[in-house]
């Protein structure tokens, strides 16, 4: 399949070009002390506001997973809905939202996961994933990996097979990739487009 934006063939072994990475990185904004003091927040809204940047992002995500036979894309609340929904259409896969408790109207499965202080929970509608379906977990950012790991646990709870994890941004210094590898195994590749080291 040829990308109308980049003019390249989708190849799941290909890596993003340096030009594409520079372009996307230029559309990510650092916001100091948000949502609390000491946090350097990666704001994706400039990327979303630029049609070319958004096209490139979706092209690169689809390029990586087009050969993985994905049946279901799970998007994690809330920015995972943006990328996951669009990516599911490109991969001809179903889209399933994972949300915080009390946001989904029908019966749900729920998992709890650890935060730095305390715990949080995620929910998915029961019956969203058929047993044996190959599931791709999508979110905007990989930090510690707890949220994505919980979404994968929900998918497995319904009998799904985790085919991989896809992120726009990864904070390499927070260890999320290692956590996902530990819990999901090497059979579930972790792909992030833009990487940041500490202090970037």
From Swiss-Prot:
Instruction: For this UniProt record, give its keywords in alphabetical order, as a comma-separated list.
Output: Cytoplasm, Glycosyltransferase, Purine salvage, Transferase
Known pathway: Purine metabolism; AMP biosynthesis via salvage pathway; AMP from adenine: step 1/1
As one GO molecular function, the record gives: adenine binding
Subcellular location(s) of the protein: Cytoplasm
Catalysis: reaction(s)? AMP + diphosphate = 5-phospho-alpha-D-ribose 1-diphosphate + adenine
Q: Which GO terms describe its cellular component?
A: cytoplasm
What residue intervals traverse the membrane? none
Q: Which residues form a coiled coil?
A: none
Which GO BP terms sit in this record?
Answer: adenine salvage; AMP salvage; purine ribonucleoside salvage
Q: Which CDD domains match?
A: PRTases_typeI (cd06223)
- The domain of life for this entry's organism is Bacteria
Q: Which InterPro entries match?
A: Ade_phspho_trans, PRibTrfase_dom, PRTase-like, UPRTase/APRTase
According to its UniProt record, the EC number is: 2.4.2.7
Q: What subunit structure does UniProt give? A: Homodimer.
Task: Describe the family membership recorded for this protein in Swiss-Prot or TrEMBL.
Answer: Belongs to the purine/pyrimidine phosphoribosyltransferase family.
| Functional note | Catalyzes a salvage reaction resulting in the formation of AMP, that is energically less costly than de novo synthesis.
Name listed for the protein in its UniProt record: Adenine phosphoribosyltransferase
Organism annotation:
Sorangium cellulosum (strain So ce56) (Polyangium cellulosum (strain So ce56))
The organism's taxonomy opens as:
Bacteria, Pseudomonadati, Myxococcota, Polyangia, Polyangiales
Provide the gene name from the record: apt
């Amino acid at each position: 399949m040829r990308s109308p934006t980049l003019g390249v063939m989708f190849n799941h072994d290909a890596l993003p070009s340096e030009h594409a990475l520079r372009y996307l990185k230029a559309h990510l904004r650092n916001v100091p002390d948000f949502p609390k003091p000491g946090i350097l927040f990666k704001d994706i809204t400039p990327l979303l506001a630029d049609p070319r940047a958004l096209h490139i992002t979706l092209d690169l995500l689809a390029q990586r997973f087009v050969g993985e036979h994905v049946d279901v894309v799970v998007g994690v609340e809330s920015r995972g809905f943006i990328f996951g929904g669009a990516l599911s259409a490109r991969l001809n896969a179903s889209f399933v939202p994972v949300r915080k408790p009390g946001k989904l109207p029908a019966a749900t499965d729920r998992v709890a996961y650890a935060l730095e202080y305390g715990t949080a929970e995620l929910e998915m509608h029961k019956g969203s994933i058929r047993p044996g379906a190959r599931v791709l977990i999508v979110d905007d950012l990989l930090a510690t990996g707890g949220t994505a790991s919980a979404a994968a646990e929900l998918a497995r709870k319904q009998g799904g097979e985790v085919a991989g994890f896809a992120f726009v941004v990864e904070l390499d210094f927070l260890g999320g990739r290692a956590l996902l590898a530990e819990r999901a195994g090497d059979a579930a590749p972790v792909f992030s487009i833009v990487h940041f080291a500490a202090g970037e």
